[in-house]
Regions:
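Bacterial N-terminal signal peptides
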Residues: 13-26
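Intrinsic, low-complexity polybasic segments
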Residues: 9-10
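Extracytosolic ligand-binding ectodomains
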Residues: 2-6, 15, 32-403
Length: 403
């Protein structure tokens, strides 16, 4: 066989194929370019309502902003259920999303233990990971491909300890759920409160699966501190904590209850009832805020999900996360390069987020306004009413542990 002729025949065939392809492309629209985004949240179990808040915010953002994507570009969300705090399952789901489903961006990150497991994978695989609500400071240290759009417990608890000390309260007790964010919150509040001249007279870490809180809270009552710093992961646990404080008589005593916004979770306030009245929290969002950006957000939310549905700070973290992802996609015209994506995300900003102006710093952490809120009756229902602002707070833990 004449080798030269075979090559020539191949070239001729390829020329015919190319010509045919060009003819077809002239009459058939170019196939849309799909960006696959893996979304790992809790869709089942006792904490599914928290995951639903994030998922609803993601859906709402996509519905309102899909038309802003470059022509021919679409986003496909591939959802996976981590069932709750389950780092092994979260890691496996992330591996499947990257290797089998070929996602180009990971997001979700509802729980710190799960987000830590997922983040560790992204370094080797070079997959951008936008964690939305994991509050442990260490999450963004696991990989240069991680940013967060929610908060950290150091961010919400260190300034709260400073504020508490300035109120003249001398003695504090800390009560936290026993996992990484609780440890962070305890450490942050303790540091700032004692730096301000206060003393920690007792502390307790409560296992996440505990349902009987009274033995723990009896110790708090016996210590009779001026103030109790409380952290739990929100949702139904927030109501269980508050009801236990009420049952043992702390909510009716002179002991003040304070904490990050998880402990008066907006969706749970109707279940807490009057036991939550007067509780002060520090957080990045309240649906009752009168900022125009928030009024617009709540209106869009309730148009989509009904007037009885209330967006929480979990929802806003999901909204911020999808906004950052969409902006990264638009900036690259739908061509996702991992390193270029991370360069865009570090420094990304939104001056009109529902919670106020935000940006992501070079450590991958969100910088945002924090609001002191008090549970009050508002138009016949309980609400977290903002009464003071601490502007543009980053993650203090990163500052204190800078190498």
């Amino acid at each position: 066989m004449n080798h030269t002729k075979v090559i020539g025949a191949g070239l001729l065939c390829r020329g015919v194929v190319v010509a045919a392809a060009l003819m077809i492309s002239a009459i058939v629209p170019v196939e849309a370019q799909t960006i696959k985004v893996g979304l790992i949240l809790t869709y089942s179990g006792s904490d599914a309502a928290l995951g639903e808040q994030i998922d609803r915010a993601v859906n709402l953002f996509v519905k309102l902003h899909d038309s802003e994507l470059p022509p021919g570009v679409k986003v496909e969300l591939i959802r996976r259920d981590d069932t709750g705090i389950n780092p092994d399952l979260a890691k496996r789901l992330a591996q499947e999303l990257v290797l089998r489903d070929q996602v180009q961006i990971l997001t979700g990150g509802q729980w710190t233990p799960n987000a830590m497991a997922v983040a560790a994978l992204t370094k080797e695989g070079k997959v951008p990971f936008v964690t939305m609500t994991a509050g442990g400071s260490a999450v963004t240290l696991q990989s240069p491909y991680v940013v967060r759009t929610g908060w950290t417990l150091w961010q919400t608890s260190y300034p709260l300890g400073e504020w508490a000390a300035k109120q003249g309260w001398k003695n504090a007790y800390t009560v936290v759920s026993d996992f990484a964010p609780g440890h962070d919150g305890e450490a942050a509040f303790t540091k700032s409160f004692t730096e301000g001249g206060g003393a920690i007279v007792g502390s307790v870490r409560i296992p996440l699966k505990t349902t009987d809180y009274l033995p723990y809270f009896q110790k708090v009552k016996d210590a009779n501190p001026d103030v109790v710093y409380v952290f739990n992961p929100g949702g139904p646990q927030a109501t269980a904590f508050m009801k236990a404080f009420e049952d043992i008589g702390i909510t009716k005593s002179k002991i003040r209850l304070i904490g990050p916004s998880d402990i008066t979770y907006d969706q749970e306030l109707p279940n807490m009832g009057r036991s939550a009245l007067g509780v002060i929290t520090l957080g990045q969002y309240s649906p009752s805020a009168t900022r125009q950006a928030n009024l617009d957000f709540v209106a869009a939310w309730q148009k989509e999900y009904g007037t009885d549905s209330v967006p929480t700070f979990f929802a806003v973290a999901g909204w911020n996360g999808m906004h950052a992802i969409y902006d990264a996609i638009k900036a690259q015209n739908g061509k996702i390069d991992p390193d270029a994506t991370m360069k865009l995300l570090h420094g990304w900003s939104d001056p009109t987020s529902p919670g106020g102006p935000i940006h992501i710093d070079q450590a991958g952490d969100i910088v945002q306004n924090l609001y002191l809120r008090r549970v009050e009756e508002n138009s016949g229902h309980l609400a977290n009413i903002e009464f003071a602002t601490i502007e543009q707070v980053g993650d203090p833990w990163k500052v204190f542990n800078k190498k």
